[in-house]
UniProtKB/Swiss-Prot annotation:
Pfam families: P-loop_SecA, SEC-C, SecA_DEAD, SecA_PP_bind, SecA_SW. It comes from Dehalococcoides mccartyi (strain ATCC BAA-2100 / JCM 16839 / KCTC 5957 / BAV1). Monomer and homodimer. Part of the essential Sec protein translocation apparatus which comprises SecA, SecYEG and auxiliary proteins SecDF. Other proteins may also be involved. Belongs to the SecA family. It is found in: Cell membrane; Cytoplasm. Zn(2+) binds at residues 938, 940, 949-950. The gene is secA. Its EC number is 7.4.2.8. Part of the Sec protein translocase complex. Interacts with the SecYEG preprotein conducting channel. Has a central role in coupling the hydrolysis of ATP to the transfer of proteins into and across the cell membrane, serving as an ATP-driven molecular motor driving the stepwise translocation of polypeptide chains across the membrane. This is Protein translocase subunit SecA. GO terms for biological process: intracellular protein transmembrane transport; protein import; protein targeting; protein transport by the Sec complex. ATP binds at residues 135, 153-157, 575. One of its GO terms (molecular function) is metal ion binding. Keywords: ATP-binding, Cell membrane, Cytoplasm, Membrane, Metal-binding, Nucleotide-binding, Protein transport, Translocase, Translocation, Transport, Zinc.
Length: 952
């Protein structure tokens, strides 16, 4: 790993040097662009696009055709599970896409100096900001699909305009992914005049701000003026989500881009889809998204089953279990395992509650109880109020551990959220059923070109390289950094540590320096606030409970003597300016007062940052330090640590405790030396390594479902795009007839054939003419039977089409295919979730759980594909056009209606059609019969189990 960082440093220097000649070229062009009129500057975009078009027509036409044909071949290979062909075609497709990207990059590189010069000039004219040379380098790094590490205050928002404009010239749409919905609007609106001056459209997508909004989207339009009094987004014109994606540049949050992708793959009509292909994305604060958020999947779900009384039972039971005696806590892995005494105690308590079946918790009937028990213990030991969540208006709202923000609409999965609700005695919500899901990792790996910006990526360079194939380039600062980072001070306990923190806050405040204090939880921020109040120290608190005041608090945090206590949210994306927010020069008195404050803070030493606890990740610590010393300003930082801090307790306190006892330190005397700091850093590295393994593990497991998703979503697109479904369905019918004929005509002697069973089975699909019966079929050979039945099926299909009309039949084919695909895909996701939950037991059998999951997942996916064919064949003749129209309208309604969310803003899937499932529709046209068990003999007489024959 150390070799990795050594070579990383060398390559970074070479990368920067290689870009300097381009910076010189852009600077040489500056004067010529300054002399252009506004109309001539805007016309440059038309010129650039024309030049790119001429280049592409001669260099990429053949590649595009090959990509289209290879994609179609791959889809067919995936359907028939031809693994060797899939591997070959995937490699070919990857190579073709690389060739296309290389051609596009070469063409864009040819106009890069002029395009960057145009953006620099447009920015200077419209918003008064001229890109520094280092910002030009940052823009080039982003254009080349890499991560630009830029320190806080170096102007990442402005840097992004360069590659966004350049790549938008291809006309394929580009995305800027922000960390929150405020920045999705602010950055698009702030940079809007720059893009408008160049004739490029820019939009913003963000989550609902009010219950009446539906997929809110805005387009920057100087000719539009909002009628809302005091609207900060005066020139943001409301548009549809589809229009937002048609804009040249789209700003938005990762969740909105992700849920739009999932929603598009639930829609019943291609015309309702909103996204274009995923072309180029810049991810702001990329470490936050691809590292911190990577373990969190995006899920569209709907209410499924009632929560039941078990959550309340275990909420009453868990406080009666005692740590160590009844269960052992593993702090590192964050799980609790019952001891032998614990098992006995739990069995006794559950028996009293009357919920345990049999005499042992190990009985398979009690498997659900074990899941409830684990969730209840996790809720008790690892999920604390005002740390991991808050209780607000009778709801449990998750707190993002990395940003400190409330994650409205998000819920823990697999029953954990319900366990926490039961613990806090709020209403336990229904469990949910997953209809569509994708991890953040796989979502962003879909982009043809991905890059990002952050102030802290170097510590995770190895992970970015291994998982995302992204290189990190550290961009030099415009001015030398002068912030002083003091060594950590370690105390024996929390009480002594926070007393020292209050003393340092008071000292810095009296010097006229603003102080930012970072805490890891809401509880700690409020506890420190109470200590400051008792000392009479005026301060502001910024945590998830006061997130509405965030922009205002951060704007004032740089004033002389200002004290701000904040959780990790600390205004990421908003700079803390020394002296406070810089006013306009319209009011000379106000501006002069700000200048005096600004100078006063500079002379006092700038912003002082205090960290009250080391985070599990060094990046989060560095982000807090990075609030100070922006753009060459003075500043300082220091971390205070106690031996009973979470990270110390879990990963390193014993060694440091020994050092302190050896040194004879009392609780009020801190220790500060290199050995302690190194021990702390090593503890953080171990935690980072652990989380890296977890994320890598997540990718490997999700890749299994991702392959399934690619096949199903590609097939769905094909259905929506008007593919010839009739020939596909007739092929399925022929395949079913061939399979069933072979099954029922085994043996050399026709007397051994089960022709009654064959006729019964086929009559379950369509009604055979009276003359085609077992007696008539007995006179034919196996081949003749197949030909006769196939011909009859085709004639009956044509008869149905003649009766309903060709147009209606095509619509019916589409609806049945869509509904079957959607409903069975939902079932498959549930099967895969359950499989993943249980697969860990394979380790006890000395089998690799991942390999077992891949193998079992492959078997289940083949079963899914076969079941899709089976259900389509068994429904196409039976479902009438009236029911089909109901299905169409219900599908459209379901795809656009919001439902209970596991993540923000899901919509109900096309499959969720109340009362009009394929099964229900079929039953409405056939007589009721006694229900057949899946393991019962099939009534067709084949001798096989029902689930393996007609019950497939």
């Amino acid at each position: 790993m150390f070799k990795f960082f050594s070579s990383f440093g060398d390559s970074n220097e070479k990368e920067i040097r290689a870009l300097e000649p381009l910076v010189d070229k852009i600077n040489q062009l500056e004067n010529s662009f300054t002399t252009l009129s506004d109309e001539a500057l805007k016309a440059k975009t038309i010129e650039f696009r024309a030049r790119l078009k001429d280049t592409f027509e001669t260099t990429t036409a053949g590649i595009q055709e090959d990509i289209t044909s290879t994609t179609a071949e791959l889809a067919e290979a995936q359907k028939i599970a031809d693994n060797s062909k899939q591997s070959r075609l995937k490699a070919k497709l990857e190579s073709l896409n690389k060739d296309l990207s290389a051609k596009e990059t070469t063409a864009l590189n040819g106009i890069l100096p002029e395009a960057f010069a145009a953006v620099r000039e447009a920015s200077r004219r419209t918003i008064g900001l001229r890109h520094y040379d280092v910002q030009l380098i940052g823009g080039m790094v982003l254009h080349h699909g890499k991560i630009a590490e830029m320190r806080t205050g170096e102007g990442k928002t402005l840097v992004a305009t360069l590659p966004l404009y350049l790549n938008s010239l291809l006309g394929k749409g580009v995305h800027l992914v922000t960390v929150n919905d405020y920045l999705a609007r602010r950055d698009a609106y702030w940079m809007g005049p720059v893009y408008h001056a160049l004739g490029v459209s820019v939009s913003s997508i963000y989550p609902m701000q009010t219950p009446t909004e539906e997929l809110p989207s805005r387009l920057f339009d100087p000719d539009y003026t909002s009628e809302i009094p005091g609207d900060p987004w005066t020139h943001f014109r409301p548009i549809s989500r589809q229009e937002a994606y048609k804009a040249d540049i789209t700003y938005g949050t990762s969740t909105e881009f992700g849920f739009d992708y999932l929603r598009d793959n639930l829609r019943p009509d291609l015309a309702q889809c909103v996204q274009r292909d995923m072309n180029y994305a810049i991810v702001d604060e990329i470490d936050n998204l691809l590292i911190d958020e990577a373990r969190t999947p995006l899920i569209i779900s709907a209410p499924d089953t009632e929560a039941g009384k078990l959550y309340d039972v275990f909420a009453r039971l868990s406080p009666r279990l005692v740590a160590v005696k009844d269960y052992e806590i593993n702090e590192k892995d964050r799980n609790a395992e019952l001891t032998e005494d614990g098992w006995a105690n739990v069995e006794k308590l559950l028996s009293r509650e009357g919920v345990m079946k049999g005499n042992s918790l190990y009985d398979p009937q009690n498997a659900p109880l074990i899941r409830h028990l684990r969730n209840a213990l996790s809720a008790k030991e690892f999920y604390k109020k005002d740390h991991q969540y808050v209780v607000k208006e009778g709801e449990i709202i998750i707190i993002d551990e990395f940003t400190g923000r409330m994650m409205l609409g998000r819920r823990y999965s697999e029953g954990l959220h319900q366990a926490i609700e039961a613990k806090e005695h709020v209403k336990v919500q229904q469990e949910s059923k997953t209809y569509a899901t994708v991890t953040i990792q796989n979502l962003f790996r879909m982009y043809r070109k991905l890059c990002g910006m952050t102030g802290t990526a170097a510590t995770e360079a190895e992970e970015f390289s291994k998982i995302y194939k992204l290189e990190v380039v550290i961009i030099p600062t415009n001015k030398p950094a002068v912030r002083e980072d003091y060594g950590d001070q370690i105390y024996k306990d929390q009480s002594a540590k926070f007393k020292a923190v209050v003393n340092e806050i008071d000292e810095m405040r009296k010097l006229g320096r603003p102080v930012l204090v970072g805490t890891v939880s809401i509880e700690n921020s409020e506890m420190l606030s109470n200590m400051l109040k008792r000392q009479g120290i005026e301060h502001k608190v910024l945590n998830a409970k006061q997130h509405e005041k965030e922009a205002q608090v951060v704007a004032e945090a740089g004033k002389p003597g200002a004290v701000t206590v904040a959780t990790n949210m600390a205004g990421r994306g908003v700079d803390i300016l020394l002296g406070g927010k810089e006013p306009t020069k319209d009011d000379a008195k106000v501006y002069n007062e700000w200048q005096a404050h600004h100078q006063q803070v500079l002379e006092a030493g700038g912003l002082h940052v205090i960290g009250t606890e080391r985070h599990e990740s060094r990046r989060i610590d560095n982000q807090l330090r990075g609030r100070s010393g922006r753009q060459g300003d003075p500043g300082s930082s220091r971390f205070y640590v106690a031996l009973d801090d979470d990270i110390m307790r879990r990963f390193g306190s014993e060694r440091i405790q020994g050092i302190m006892e050896w040194a004879g330190m009392d609780e009020n005397t801190p220790i500060e030396n290199g050995l302690v700091s190194r021990t702390l850093e090593n503890a953080q590295k171990r935690v980072e390594g652990y989380h890296f393994d977890v994320r890598k593990h997540l990718v490997e497991y999700d890749d299994v479902v991702n392959k399934h998703r690619e096949v199903i979503y590609a097939e769905r697109r094909k259905i929506l795009s008007g593919a010839d479904l009739k020939s596909n369905i007739l092929d399925m019918i022929r395949e079913e007839i061939i399979t069933q004929t072979a099954e029922h005509t085994r043996g050399y002697d026709s007397s051994e054939w089960n022709l009654d069973g064959l006729v019964t089975h086929l009559n379950g699909i369509f009604t055979l003419p009276a003359e085609i019966n077992a007696e008539a079929l007995a006179k034919l050979s196996q081949e003749e039977i197949t030909d006769l039945l196939t011909r009859t099926a085709e004639e009956l299909y044509q008869k149905k089409e003649d009766e309903t009309g060709a147009g209606s039949m095509r619509l019916l084919e589409r609806i049945i295919m869509l509904h079957t695909l959607d409903s069975l895909w939902v079932e498959h996701l549930t099967i895969m979730e359950n499989l993943r939950r249980e697969i860990g037991l394979q380790a006890f059998a000395q089998r690799d759980p991942l390999i077992a999951y891949k193998n079992e997942g492959h078997v289940r996916f083949q079963e899914l594909l076969e079941t899709i064919k089976h259900d389509v064949v068994h429904n196409i003749y039976r479902i009438g056009i009236q029911i089909q129209h109901q299905t169409e309208s219900a599908t459209a309604k379901a795809a656009s209606s919001p439902v209970q969310q596991q993540k923000p803003l899901p919509a109900a899937p096309a499959a969720a059609i109340p009362g009009v499932s394929a099964k229900a529709a079929t039953q409405s046209t056939t007589p009721a019969a006694k229900e057949i068990g899946r393991n019962d003999p099939c009534p067709c007489g084949s001798g096989k189990k029902y689930k393996k024959c007609c019950g497939k």
